[in-house]
Amino acid sequence: MKIFYILFILGLWSCTAASQTVVSVDAKQIINEGYIGNGAQWDPYQLDYGKGRLNISEADWKKMYDRLDFMRPQFIRVMTNTTSVMQDGVLYPERGLEHLSHILDYCQSRDVTVMFGDWRGVMVDARKEVIREKNLSAAAEYVRFLIEEKGYSCIKYYNLVNEPNGYWSSTDGKYSLWARAIRFFYGELQKNKLAGKLSVVGPDAAIWTADEAWWVDIFATHLKDEIGLYDIHTYPSKITVNSGEYTDIIRAYKQAVPAGRKIVMGEIGFKFVEPADSVYQRENLRRAAAKPYASMDDSQMFVYDFMYGTDMADALFQTVNAGYSGSVVWMLDDAMHAKEAPDKLKVWGFWNIFGEEYFGTEEEEVRPWFYAWSL
């Protein structure tokens, strides 16, 4: 009986020992000097969802300001289409400013670093493989106007063409075409005496594996003078992050960045692309189909769940530990973008500011993952 008792105690001890996790903190090692910060994508809103134009009330702007003050973002990405403020080839920079200014005013008043840019804005013609110099010049003049004439010194970085490595991009994945556009645009910034005030960002590549790291490598080789900040976009699967594989993937891009330069995550979110996450993807599609205003093609319906917050925190910690200097989450507000139709929103946000006015009062409430990202 005594032997049995001893074995029983040893068994309990071994189970307890096996379950212990040792966490060590190295307070002396610096992972990243001069961290830019974390924040969110905050673009000018679509406003027309198929039944006439809506306007964001001052009360709703205040509501967003108050929520952002709780979050305390340090880094905001703002993307526009320069051609939306052009007519017959002429730039009208004041057009739409009453809307854009609310976003930039917040960032300027809170000392938030802004990555401004152009989604594509017919800056290139992939079929003819030519750059559109007139539009590129207009983009350079537009950002000069915002910085010099309107005083938005919070704009520190410029992102020309979203995800140029993708077949969905206006560049159709053609590196040489995009590189020519970057060189020309940088020359226009120099003409406008902005080269010392505004840094160009790139390659802005969307990645799921380490296979696209050559974009950073070739970028660092051919455009080292033009580029002031490196960035990529990641939409990993849940299993990729939870397993820790995500760190290995994004580290490949950090290692391709020249010494002394920084790289940030220009967009980050989750997509259930791996077979191991197929159950989540089926549920994601089921939820999107059940919600009248959700895009079936481009929505993350788990933003309503606490799980999404813990997963995003996991991804952020791995990104920081891999040596990145900031992360911009996709995205702040559902009401910014639609996909298949004007009322089929990309549901990815912390909320939908037009919930009470149009999409359902409950949609305007803050979702759980906002708090995880705010920590």
Which sequence ranges carry the predicted segments?
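Glycoside hydrolase catalytic-domain groove-lining segments
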Residues: 237-295, 315
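Extracytoplasmic/secreted proteins, especially bacterial periplasmic and envelope-associated proteins
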Residues: 59, 63, 98-102, 134-141, ...
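Sec-dependent N-terminal signal peptides
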Residues: 3-13
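Substrate-binding cleft and catalytic face of glycoside hydrolase catalytic domains
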Residues: 68-240
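Mature N-terminal, pre-catalytic/accessory segment of carbohydrate-active enzymes
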Residues: 15-62, 66, 71-74
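Substrate-binding cleft/loops of secretory-pathway carbohydrate-active enzymes
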Residues: 134, 204-233, 271-292, 335-344
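Short, flexible/disordered intra-domain loops and linkers
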Residues: 50-56, 88-92, 128-130, 170-173, ...
